[in-house]
Amino acid sequence: MAAMSAATEIANASRSGESAPISCLSTLIGSLVDVLRTNLSRKADRVRIFEVGRVFKRDPSVLDSDQTVGGFDQPVRVSALAYGPADAQQWGVSSRSVDFFDVKGDVEALLAPRTVAFVPAEHPAFHPGRCARVQVGGRDVGVMGELHPKWRQAYDLPQAPVLFELDAAVLTERVVPSFTSVPRMQSVFRDLALVVKDSTS
């Protein structure tokens, strides 16, 4: 799935036991789909997985330092995937597949209590018309959607998983609640009953 994200190849680097070079990807989505396929090959029918890690994007404005590599931005991302039945098997509940709105609810819960907006978008990993940019406070913080049919076919998946990827930094941004002092006077409640003529409107 590296083809859908501008992968950056590391010179003279390979995985243990593999001759192929390591690529620094700009998204975690591909690795989640790889894990899904492994689980399906072991007969798992309901899969929920997540990953936290750095992605790599070319950015000429980034300079060399003790924590950065010149020309590359390395933000931390949180990505997750849901596949299969929406709910665990139980009596009296009909089975249905997880969908866009189930994962949308997960994203809203993850970012609560902030208000989250979902804006229709296009992304090479996701199904056209079933993809959205995730916004908090008017700024893009991630993307979510159903896996593109092209990738579903390439990975030979019986059905499409739903995924999201968020900027990890937004998860640590918390609005500090404001407090007010307790009122000196207690509130008072009174029940009133009024008797009026029927002709009164």
Residue ranges and their predicted role:
Residues 1, 11-201:
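Extended beta-strand-rich architecture
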